[in-house]
């Protein structure tokens, strides 16, 4: 697929790890990697405008196929001129396949070889999503990077179930490739599954690599397994993927997981974490997480993070942001969300510099110490 609309350019490998500095070229522009991608589930990153996302350095954002199919509908978005025009975002967009949401949100789902029947979580109506339909929806949305329809088995499901699941996912990937009507301007990624089983991850990767996708996603992680288990899966999975194509770790956004994913050769990450925890008043800072709603910040007239130069930290204090959140003012959610997104986008900028300087392991050690991962701060 050398004529693919998605191209990966390797700039530099880090001397001491599997990390790589590169860039991904898409029909709507080029972005540097490794990159964290903010999630815009409903064609908006919660509380943030496209201008703010550009200001903080988001080179690409993610939108959700399942949610946009249900509301407002992919055909309406196509009539609007596609997702880029609909949401006024002129940079790259990645869409997931809808598979994960079907398994995690939908009730009464029934998986067959043809696809998945499930109940619409908005109105209870019966819906059917197949590999072909997932591709058709994404073709209507017009994203730069699309995902194959896959089943995301739970990490601790039995071996026999996971084996059948990955074999079906490979067949679905092949069906999706055939159904893809816009290969000239949308790049379709295959998704490697296999839970924690090394041989099944290898089988899944080999199946998908043989289909020559323009890029590869690693799915089925950040679903309840330990950090060590995730790293172990990455250790044996990323080497199976082509060096000349992008590697995307789905649903991962905790700072330590981002750094450890990069060390193992991953280029792209996404997660709702920064905006989700921001709405509860939890902020990521260079010295660990800070719950700005707490009473101790009532008269704290300093920034959220003394080492951050984002819009929030440059202009507002902990006391003011705490007041906004306590008063249920939307502006408080905007400020905490902006800061958390900026924190992760900026973290990846620092990671890219550390790769350039060949000191990523030292950067990791320093970051982990400051952030407090040695103080039972596992989840953020």
UniProtKB/Swiss-Prot annotation:
Active site: 96, 270
Gene Ontology CC entries for this record: cytosol
Lineage top rank: taxon: Bacteria
Region (RNA binding): 251-257, 275-279
Gene3D superfamilies: Queuine tRNA-ribosyltransferase-like
SUPFAM superfamilies in the cross-refs: tRNA-guanine transglycosylase
GO MF entry, a single one: tRNA-guanosine(34) queuine transglycosylase activity
Residue numbers binding Zn(2+): 308, 310, 313, 339
Family: Belongs to the queuine tRNA-ribosyltransferase family.
Quaternary state and interactors: Homodimer. Within each dimer, one monomer is responsible for RNA recognition and catalysis, while the other monomer binds to the replacement base PreQ1.
Protein name per its UniProtKB record: Queuine tRNA-ribosyltransferase
Species classification: Bacteria, Bacillati, Bacillota, Bacilli, Lactobacillales
């Amino acid at each position: 697929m050398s004529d693919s609309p998605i191209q990966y350019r390797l700039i530099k490998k880090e001397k001491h790890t599997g990390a790589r500095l590169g860039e991904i070229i898409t029909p709507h522009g080029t972005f540097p990697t490794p990159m964290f991608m903010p999630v815009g589930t409903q064609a908006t990153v919660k509380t943030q405008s496209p201008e703010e996302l550009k200001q903080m350095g988001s080179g690409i954002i993610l939108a959700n196929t399942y949610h946009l199919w249900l509301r407002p509908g992919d055909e309406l978005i196509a009539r609007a001129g596609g997702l880029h025009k609909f949401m006024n975002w002129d940079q790259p967009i990645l869409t997931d396949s809808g598979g994960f949401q079907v398994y995690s949100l939908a009730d009464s789902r029934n998986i067959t070889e043809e696809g998945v029947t499930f109940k619409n979580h908005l109105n209870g109506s019966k819906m059917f999503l197949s590999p072909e339909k997932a591709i058709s929806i994404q073709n209507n949305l017009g994203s730069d990077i699309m995902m194959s329809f896959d089943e995301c088995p739970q990490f601790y499901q039995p071996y026999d179930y996971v084996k059948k699941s990955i074999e079906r996912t490979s067949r679905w990937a092949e069906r999706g490739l055939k159904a893809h009507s816009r290969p000239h301007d949308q790049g379709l990624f295959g998704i490697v599954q296999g839970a924690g089983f090394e041989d099944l991850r290898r089988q899944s990767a080999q199946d998908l690599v043989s289909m020559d996708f323009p890029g590869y996603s690693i799915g089925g992680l950040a679903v309840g397994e330990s950090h060590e288990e995730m790293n172990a899966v990455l250790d044996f999975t990323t080497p199976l993927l082509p060096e000349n194509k992008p590697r995307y770790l789905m649903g991962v956004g905790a700072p330590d997981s981002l750094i450890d994913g990069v060390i193992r050769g991953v280029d792209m990450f996404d997660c709702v974490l920064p905006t989700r925890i921001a709405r509860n008043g939890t902020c990521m800072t260079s010295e660990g997480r800070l719950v700005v709603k707490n009473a101790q910040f009532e008269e704290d007239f300093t920034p959220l993070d003394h080492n951050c130069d984002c819009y929030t930290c440059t202009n507002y204090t902990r006391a003011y942001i705490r007041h906004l959140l306590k008063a249920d003012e939307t502006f408080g959610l905007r400020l905490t969300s902006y800061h958390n997104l900026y924190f992760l986008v900026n973290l990846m900028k620092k990671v890219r510099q550390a790769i350039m300087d060949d000191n990523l392991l030292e950067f990791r050690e320093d970051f982990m110490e400051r952030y407090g991962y040695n103080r039972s701060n596992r989840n953020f």
